[in-house]
Amino acid sequence: MHNSLRDGYSLFLYTIQGRKAGTRMSLLISGYIFQRKDKGGCMKAFLILEDGTVFEGTSIGSTREVISEIVFNTSMTGYLEVLTDPSYAGQAVVMTYPLIGNYGTLNSITQGPKPYCKGFIVGELCDFPSNWQNEGLFSEYLRLHGIPCLYDVDTRAITRVLRNHGVMKGVLVRSDYPMEDIQKLFKQDLPTDQVMRVTTKWQGMRGDKNAEFHVAVMDYGVKENILRSLEAAGCRLTVFPADAKAEDVLAANPDGVFLSNGPGDPQDLGYAVEEVKKLFGKKPIFGICMGHQVLAQAYGGTTFKLKFGHR
């Protein structure tokens, strides 16, 4: 094995030719050319939790500093879906599965028009994906969308801290970031009502106009796959902004109302709760995730923050 090649290439038994040219590596194995683009422009960076715990890794994507809630996700697959899920808006996500990016990217499985995570924290970032549908490197996707990512870090150690102490604030910063400014970051209040940052801005329709059922979707941060599933079940959809009025929903005359998933604290959605109350007895209502909690509050229930957040 050519000594300039490592990581994924160590899987191969022998090399016919190995060379390095500029910022690209090329390896000829058994008549096939495998290429990768070096993770150029990377630098050391830190995740600092509010309890003072520090984890060192390497930065890729955007190099801007991040202050956010740090949560973990234990999924073995679906890293692209997590990154683009509006439910993670305003949060930095720690992926516990050790290898991320191994099947590349595929636009058809994204859950929103763009990434919503404020930061992404992974163990090993694969730059040699294996997937016949792959459309590009995950590292390039992070760069393209300006998402700060910390890799080469022990994500399971981070998760143990969060498991023992609960979800907490954290900052992602470059190694050259001024120490005095880190304290200023921790003093910042995290944004509230993330729903209004991710909801659609206008009413719209999608699906087969001749479908048997018509469903009004209250978009608190709805995932694309939920919309696709409703369409596949024979529904045409009218998607409303999170702050839509009940009279506008009823004017569309849907067969039922769907309250979607979304990010943040449901107690910030008093405006949505009041409108849902006005739908009682008029249309069937179904809620999922955030929508479920909005519906519970409309019926007089209360909600509280869980220790671990998303898992």
What are the functions of these language-model segments?
Residues 24, 28-42:
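Short, Lys/Arg-enriched N-terminal segments with co-localized hydrophobic residues
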Residues 1-4, 22:
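Targeting/processing segments of secretory and organellar proteins
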Residues 15, 21-23:
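Ala/Thr-enriched low-complexity intrinsically disordered regions
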Residues 5, 10-13, 35:
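Short hydrophobic targeting helices and cationic amphipathic motifs
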Residues 256, 261-311:
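Cysteine-nucleophile active-site neighborhood
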Residues 42-214, 218-243, 247, 252, ...:
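RNA-binding accessory domains that recognize and position tRNA/RNA substrates
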